[in-house]
Amino acid sequence: MKRNLLLIGVLLFCNQCFSWDLSGIAGSRSNAMGNFSVALHDFWSVQNDPAGMADFRTISLGFSYENRFFMKELSYYNGAFVLPVNFGTFGLSFSRFGFENYNENKFGLAFARAFSPYLKMGLKLDYLLFNFNDDYEKKKAATFELGLQSDITDNLCIGVYIFNPHHAKLKTLHNIRLPVVFRFGLSYKVTKDFLACTEAEYNSDKSLDYRFGLEYNTLKEFYIRVGVHTNPATASFGVGYTLHRVIIDVSASMDQHTGVSFQSSLIFKIKEPNL
């Protein structure tokens, strides 16, 4: 009985607060900057906006983990692999949200290419798997993501991203449609060491979310980051450090209603291919 009550409670919490977590932001860098992601060029673009990995030139492997509100049932895991080739960049990714009796899983294959500094495009194909518990049939769906980025100047980048534009349907009793997510934003290098970012996200299941983030490179390999976003009202901060070929990022965020979440991520730079 207690197990069933816990399951029902978590399901209601997930649907009301997160409205599915299929397009959740991966990587502590973005998490620390108010969940900003759409105009960044980094490893976790493979999850957040595939266009951002178009210029990524290092074979890399990464993992991230988020503990939300000190509840293991709301854990969020990400893993990804990025492979640059002569004609673009490929990426593989996996994410999982939830726990044994309820979890959302996303498997992705991405490709991005820079046609010029002014046009970078990325496409990602997703296979979605939902596990409710042993008493229910697993639910599956397929969708895709598109990203565009443009470096207007050496200091200014504009990004656009859309998840699930065809409003994929999950075959259940009520034929639930998964949300469409659209992001638009820009990043601006105020100086070579200081980055300012802003972004708006539309989710067909929620109100608009406005995001603002700052990143400061205090030392050669050390970064400090802060950010806020509005839905729900959340403040965040974090730090990042590059140790040889390993990038270590940690962050924390405070939601006004539900409390503190922590995220950490590791990126391993394996090799720079001869392209």
Q: What feature does the model see in each segment?
A:
Residues 4-14:
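Sec-dependent N-terminal signal peptides
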Residues 15-19:
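Bacterial Sec-dependent signal peptides at the C-terminal "C-region" and cleavage site
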Residues 20-275:
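Subset of outer-membrane beta-barrel
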